């Protein structure tokens, strides 16, 4: 299997399967001299790890990260552990696998999953928990994202769940402080209360539901990205689309821009006090012509309902026989919830990569 690496200068390769011994990543291209401790990475992993509420999978994984390489400390570093510029290997052990839950479906194709397509492509697949196609892989991305944040300390990246099923938040109630106060990463306290009742009913039905996630990067300087094939928004879209269960991505106003007139959609400018242009709106989501404008970079993506549900569904097995299938095991009733820290990580990795690419071509030119 190829295509397990993304990025150009800040490169991340992830490895591991849902029920394997461990998973992790190798981060190559991280500049030397950055302070990096396991605790920095663990803080991000703890936000994503499973089993923290009844609204996520009850698989209990501590997700303890180990830094295997790429850092060093001695008396000359003042006791600080610093990156060396060499590949940073990060490992997270799997400790709570229940592979027996999947023994009954080893030869069956679960509707909505990658079972059939993996078989069609490779002729062999790890059916335990979805193997490489499991959202468990995203733990490695979150670990890499924690390293990426060290490369872009002046940029603040935050994400939130802004819709669950048909229920969108009231943007007038948006409060970033609320994101850490409820199990949904929701910025609207009233919507979070609704989601609790709504998702409880979904769980009792043995079903699942989708969500919309919004991620915002503030402090992004103008100039990141490149025309045509190196567009910042193209790389962000690819990064978000690579997250499990994501079926649509939009930048700024996205698809809503199609309903606007030109005079409504254009981000008008006036002169700022610092001599730089000041934008009067941000319909473009902080990116124009594939290059950051200095406005907040805004990305949203849609996550489909978790495919593993207790409702019987029609399918076939490897022999072509028609079957009715119920997926057992421990699953997220809304996989979009834990996609929030993953979205932040992918934004961080892309912005770190483009920061290094910009620096490589233009030096430190602001």
Swiss-Prot record:
Any GO BP: amino acid biosynthetic process
Protein name: Chorismate synthase
Cofactor mode of binding and number, as noted: Reduced FMN (FMNH(2)).
Pathway this chain belongs to: Metabolic intermediate biosynthesis; chorismate biosynthesis; chorismate from D-erythrose 4-phosphate and phosphoenolpyruvate: step 7/7
GO molecular function, one term: chorismate synthase activity
Class in the EC hierarchy, top level: lyase
Function field: This reaction introduces a second double bond into the aromatic ring system.
Subunit-level organization: Homotetramer.
């Amino acid at each position: 299997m190829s295509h397990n690496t993304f990025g150009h200068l800040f490169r991340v390769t992830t490895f591991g399967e849902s029920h394997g011994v461990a998973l992790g990543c190798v981060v190559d291209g991280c500049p030397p001299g950055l302070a990096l401790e396991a605790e920095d990475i663990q803080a991000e992993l703890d936000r994503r790890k499973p089993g923290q509420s009844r609204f996520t999978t009850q698989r209990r994984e501590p997700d303890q990260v180990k830094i295997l390489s790429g850092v060093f400390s001695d008396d000359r570093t003042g006791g600080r552990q610093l990156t060396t510029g060499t590949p940073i290997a990060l490992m997270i052990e799997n400790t709570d696998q229940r592979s027996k839950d999947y023994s009954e479906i080893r030869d069956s194709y679960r509707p909505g999953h990658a079972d059939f397509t993996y078989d069609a492509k490779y002729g062999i697949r790890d059916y335990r928990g979805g193997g490489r196609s499991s959202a468990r892989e995203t733990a490695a991305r979150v670990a890499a994202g924690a390293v990426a944040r060290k490369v872009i300390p002046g940029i603040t990246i935050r994400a939130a769940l802004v819709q669950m099923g048909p229920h969108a938040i009231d943007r007038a109630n948006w409060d970033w402080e609320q994101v850490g106060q409820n199990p949904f990463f929701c910025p609207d306290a009233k919507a979070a209360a609704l989601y609790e009742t709504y998702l409880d009913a979904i769980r009792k039905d043995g079903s699942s539901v989708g969500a919309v996630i919004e991620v915002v990067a503030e402090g992004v300087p103008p100039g990141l990205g490149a025309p045509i094939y190196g567009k910042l928004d193209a790389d962000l879209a690819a990064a978000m689309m690579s997250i499990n269960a994501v079926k649509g991505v939009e930048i700024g106003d996205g698809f809503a821009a199609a309903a606007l007139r030109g005079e409504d959609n254009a981000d008008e400018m006036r002169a700022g006090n610092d001599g730089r242009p000041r934008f009067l709106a941000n319909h473009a989501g902080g990116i124009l012509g594939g290059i950051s404008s200095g406005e907040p970079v805004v990305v949203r993506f849609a996550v489909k309902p978790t495919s593993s549900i207790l409702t019987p569904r029609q399918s076939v097995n490897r022999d072509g026989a028609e079957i009715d299938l119920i997926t057992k095991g421990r699953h997220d009733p809304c996989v979009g919830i834990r996609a929030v820290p993953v979205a932040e990580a992918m934004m961080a990795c892309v912005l770190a990569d483009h920061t290094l690419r910009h620096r490589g071509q233009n030096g430190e030119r602001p």
